[in-house]
Curated annotation (Swiss-Prot):
Has E3 ubiquitin-protein ligase activity. In the absence of an external substrate, it can catalyze self-ubiquitination. Acts as a scaffold protein that contributes to the effective activation of the JNK signaling pathway. This is E3 ubiquitin-protein ligase SH3RF1. It comes from Danio rerio (Zebrafish). Its main location: cytoplasm. Belongs to the SH3RF family. It holds the Pfam family SH3_1. A zinc finger (RING-type) spans 12-53. Residues 101-127, 265-328, 706-794 are annotated as: Disordered. It comes from the Eukaryota. GO terms for biological process: negative regulation of apoptotic process; neuron migration; positive regulation of JNK cascade; positive regulation of proteasomal ubiquitin-dependent protein catabolic process; protein autoubiquitination; protein ubiquitination; regulation of CD4-positive, alpha-beta T cell differentiation; regulation of CD8-positive, alpha-beta T cell proliferation. Residues 116-125, 770-784 have a biased composition (Polar residues). The gene is sh3rf1. Pathway: Protein modification; protein ubiquitination.
Length: 867
């Protein structure tokens, strides 16, 4: 190493003057000149290391000298100087003085007619023949200054650089005058030093087992660490005070120099580029190669307290995403205008279910992830339902069992083709070990909040229920306002899904919108004869008026078998995404050859079957009727909107022998007019066998998360079990009379007060004396006390109030180290949290559900321990 380069290394990092024997070394091993240290003590009242902010307890004069520095200086003094380098190794003071004097306007001009020109040539050639002692730049143009505080200079002047304000401005000095000037007016001869690679702690990083984690570097929030190098994808090595160790990258925020160091991953060698960082990345044309080489050596070795750094000329970039295969569990609707986020979500893999992979469809207003049936709960803050999306017509028979087919026509098909036909039947009604899934509910009545965490309900407003608590309260998100809170469950009604008959083969369907809200299923059968499906259908003469059901509540018409060719299922553009999904599920389930464990509409002996007289769609639109035999096939059907106001949330409005934990609207069930045996008895055996088989296959090594609730009826009658996904399809037990409905009157004695409003239209009487008819109270006069929201109890995110027979495949883990999320797809872990892990990925990341808030996402497996 030649003498000039060695001298260039021996400079104070603060004032950039050459160090001498009076320089002091701090306890953190950083060395500074005595003048700078005294200045820091005088201005701050205390001495902290300018590099790492370590507090120094002793005085400046008590600090030791740097022995290595003293020896180097002695060696340089004793070493004979080469003849050709006399000009380049001139004393620090004289070189700087010469530059300043020349910049001031020629107080030391050489004699002769070309004195001014020779002076500038000498100043310009100084960095080439020797090494300048201060960062400097040469003026390319005249600059007169536009505002007070600007530095004026002429073309060819040498300006000492003090700092870079931003990518467009420098602060510099010329002739003792300080000021600002634009970067594009100068050419940097010697760049400013690279700022130290540092990072700021965003969280506390503590060590549980100091012996096992002895290589880690603990720190507290807001500490400033010096970054040394990147160890691997998630860890970096750094220094805090006199300690060196590794720390998680996600716990800190890097400055520009540290970000470049982390990106480079290892020091680069050689040098086509100069080693200055962002400070000189926009400083105009660079000097030639002979000028770059000394700068490289200087910056790569200047901070002798940590690893050498060499930076390339490029703007500071954020660290690239380290995980590309983000998985989003569902069901969740994710709306993002950020293409990066959309692309990351789009890379999600097959989810948790082995039965069917997830489908992702990008529509005009957002990205909709349609999960497989066994995906766990995921909370989402924004839900987008495309308002004017046109849904393609999809042949029912074109939807085979899993895997689901891709969309068949327009790119705007959202979720209609995404649902697969391979939905498994749920276990028997008594076996309740399901999980909660975000479900769309509609508010049946207005409700004014009485506490801060409650949401205001407006009639007809849609909510995504994320959690159903045991006390009957729901926790969810308003799809209109995006607010999250709790609200009484008995004020809500689910946006239901239709049920298919397990005893019927493939049946053509047509879904037509009623005012863009309700959906009616009818058969385009020739047996309907003169019935015009495009016109409102008349109601049976004896039909009693009923309430308007929520959006997408479906009433099922009996469909005769063996009479219809394949037809298309049409989903109107006014339907919400969930309605479209539900419609496809209905059509798909018709195409299955195996029983679906759903309520079975028994075929009528009449050539034309009817909707029951009490089945009503939104806005009381009339339902199918026929001129003959109307009274012979009527069945009294419980309406969820009426029952919701009359029953506690843990009692089903119409199926009191099941464990339905929320009020649900009922699907109309036409039955054989001459048959009095329980519904679905003929297919009970086959359904039960298939359920047992599915349950045994799914329950291997599974953890049941639910506590079963006692049934209100000791011995439910024989009936098909509920479809796991179809919360609306409650069976109608034979002769079910609802004395338990009176229980709802006692719900107002504690907890929150506020009567559930009722409408006289909700009143319904028994529709016939048929033994299969269901009678229940629905008139407000039948109750002695108004119905109030149920008393609030602590919600448990693990207790599912939904009747779903499939438990989550999961293991319990406890968070041992807090983890801050790096993206929306990741979970925020706090120490002590319980996480239910559903999937362990090969890259060491887990996917699971956080017990604290019910959110599902990704997190590193090293932050949790199995319980």
């Amino acid at each position: 190493m030649d003498e000039s380069a060695l001298l260039d290394l021996l400079e104070c990092p603060v004032c950039l003057e050459r160090l001498d024997a009076t320089a002091k070394v701090l306890p953190c091993q950083h060395t500074f000149c005595r003048r700078c240290l005294l200045g820091i003590v005088g201005s701050r009242g205390e001495l902290r290391c300018p590099e790492c902010r370590t507090l120094v307890e002793s005085g400046v004069d008590e600090l030791p000298s740097n022995i290595l520095l003293v020896r180097l200086l002695d060696g340089i003094k004793q070493r004979p100087r080469r003849t050709g380098s006399v000009h380049g190794t001139c004393a620090n003071g004289s070189a700087v003085a010469g530059v300043r004097a020349q910049g001031a306007g020629g107080s030391q001009r050489d004699p002769g007619p070309t004195g001014g020109q020779s002076q500038r040539v000498q100043a310009k050639s100084t960095p080439v023949r020797g090494v300048p002692q201060l960062p400097c730049a040469k003026a390319l143009y005249n600059y007169d200054g536009k505002e007070p505080g600007d530095l004026k200079f002429s073309k060819g002047d040498i300006i000492i650089l003090r700092r870079q304000v931003d990518e467009n401005w420098y602060h510099g000095e010329m002739g003792g005058v300080h000021g600002f000037f634009p970067t594009n007016f100068v050419q940097v001869i010697k760049p400013l030093p690279q700022p130290p690679p540092q990072c700021k702690a965003l969280y506390d990083f503590e060590l549980k087992d100091k012996e096992a984690d002895k290589d880690c570097l603990p720190f507290s929030k807001d500490d400033i660490l010096t970054v040394i190098r990147r160890v691997d994808e998630n860890w970096a090595e750094g220094m805090l005070g006199d300690k060196i160790g590794i720390f998680p990258i996600s716990y800190v925020e890097f400055n520009s120099a540290a970000r470049q160091l982390i990106e480079l991953d290892k020091p680069s060698e050689g040098g086509g580029d100069s080693s200055e960082g962002p400070s000189s990345s926009s400083s105009g044309p660079q000097a030639n190669g002979s000028q770059k080489a000394p700068g490289e050596k200087k910056n790569s070795k200047k901070r002798h307290s940590f690893t050498s750094l060499t930076m390339s000329h490029k703007p500071c970039l954020a660290p690239p995403p380290q995980r590309h295969s983000m998985e989003i569990s569902g069901p969740v609707l994710i709306s993002s205008s950020n293409p990066t986020a959309a692309a990351r979500i789009g890379e999600l893999s097959g989810g948790l279910s082995s039965s069917a992979p997830s489908q992702v469809h990008i529509c005009t207003t957002g990205l909709i992830v349609t999960p497989p049936p066994s995906s766990p709960v995921t909370t989402a803050t924004v839900f987008t339902f495309p308002p004017e999306t046109s849904y393609a017509s999809i042949p029912v028979d074109a939807l085979p069992p899993p895997p689901p087919p891709p969309p068949q026509s327009q790119s705007s098909v959202v979720g209609a083709a995404a649902l697969n036909a391979g939905q498994r039947p749920s276990p028997a009604a008594g076996d309740q070990s399901g999980r909660q899934r975000p479900t769309v509910y509609v508010a049946m009545f207005p409700y004014s909040p009485r506490k801060e965490d409650e949401l205001e309900l407006r009639k007809g407003e849609m909510f995504l229920v994320l959690e159903r608590c045991q006390d009957g309260w729901f926790k969810g998100t308003s799809m209109h306002t995006g607010k999250i809170g709790v609200f009484p469950g008995n004020y809500m009604s689910p946006v239901s899904r239709t049920v298919s008959g397990s005893s019927q083969p493939k049946v053509p369907l047509t879904l037509c919108s009623q005012a863009g809200r309700g959906v009616t299923i009818v058969s385009p059968s020739s047996a309907l004869g003169s019935m015009d499906l495009s016109k409102p259908l008349p109601v049976c003469p004896n039909a009693t008026p009923s309430c308007s059901l929520p959006a997408a509540v479906v009433t099922a018409a009996h469909l005769p078998t063996g009479q219809h060719p394949k037809v298309l299922m049409h989903v109107t553009s006014q339907m919400t995404v969930n309605q479209a999904r539900n419609a496809v599920r209905t059509a798909v389930s018709h195409s299955q050859d195996r029983p679906t464990a759903a309520v079975t509409p028994i075929q009528s002996h009449n050539p034309v079957a009817y909707l029951p007289s009490t089945a009503v769609v939104l806005q009381a639109s009339p339902v199918l009727n026929s001129s003959s035999g109307c009274s012979s096939a009527r069945v009294g059907v419980a309406l969820g909107c009426a029952a919701a106001s009359l029953t506690p949330p843990n009692v089903s409005a119409a199926s009191l022998d099941t464990d339905a934990m929320r009020p649900v609207p009922m699907v109309a069930l036409p039955v054989n007019a001459g048959s009095t045996k329980p519904l679905g008895a003929a297919s009970n055996h086959g359904v039960a066998c298939r359920l047992d088989k599915d349950c045994k296959r799914e329950k291997k090594g599974l953890l049941k998360l639910l506590s079963n609730k006692k049934k209100l009826r000791p011995s439910p009658p024989s009936s098909p079990t509920l479809e796991a996904e179809q919360s609306v399809s409650m069976e109608l037990p034979q002769g079910a009379v609802g004395p338990e409905m009176a229980l709802s009157g006692s719900a107002g004695h504690n907890g929150r007060i506020g009567a559930c409003p009722m409408d006289s239209e909700l009143s319904m009487s028994s529709s016939s004396s048929n033994t299969d008819a269901v009678t229940h109270r629905s008139s407000p006069q039948d109750n002695t006390a108004p119905i109030a929201p149920p008393p609030r109890q602590p919600c448990s995110s693990l207790l599912s109030m939904q009747h779903d027979g499939r438990p989550i495949v999961c293991e319990r883990y406890r968070v041992v180290v807090s983890y801050p999320p790096q993206s929306e797809a990741e979970l925020e872990l706090k120490e002590g949290d319980i996480v239910f892990v559903h999937k362990k990925r090969e890259d060491g990341w887990f996917k699971g559900t956080l017990q604290r808030n019910g959110r599902t996402g990704l997190f590193p497996g090293s932050f949790v321990d199995s319980i």
